[in-house]
Amino acid sequence: STAITAAETGHLVFSTLHTIGAASTIDRIIDVFPADQQQQIRVQLSMVLLGVVSQQLVPNVKGGRSLATEVMICNGAIKNIIREGKNYQLQNTMMTSRNAGMYSMEQCLEAMYRQGIISAENYQLYTPASAATNVR
């Protein structure tokens, strides 16, 4: 609530949440509020949120860890999805908005796998099942 109010008054607010993925980050923010306030929070969030960067460390083939990221930039389509509570559409919108600077965790992990940075096993382990079936 304080962060949203600060953003509404022109302050740049950074926050960290223990979530993986933009959709779960949005859900976590909204779910903190009582059900009767959630629609208003969606509207406010859609007006002030600039973007979400999600990251996770994934074991790489050299025995260390490599950073996998997801970037969601709040353009008009993303703002509408948040406002309307259709967070299930965020993933698809990010995956088809590469030219706007967005990409999903799945796309990042697939690129890491194809470049030989992570193993097929770790690709499947860190990618939701729907995307992991695309490994070739």
Please tell me what each predicted stretch does.
Residues 1-136:
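Short, flexible helix-loop junctions that flank or precede catalytic/ligand sites
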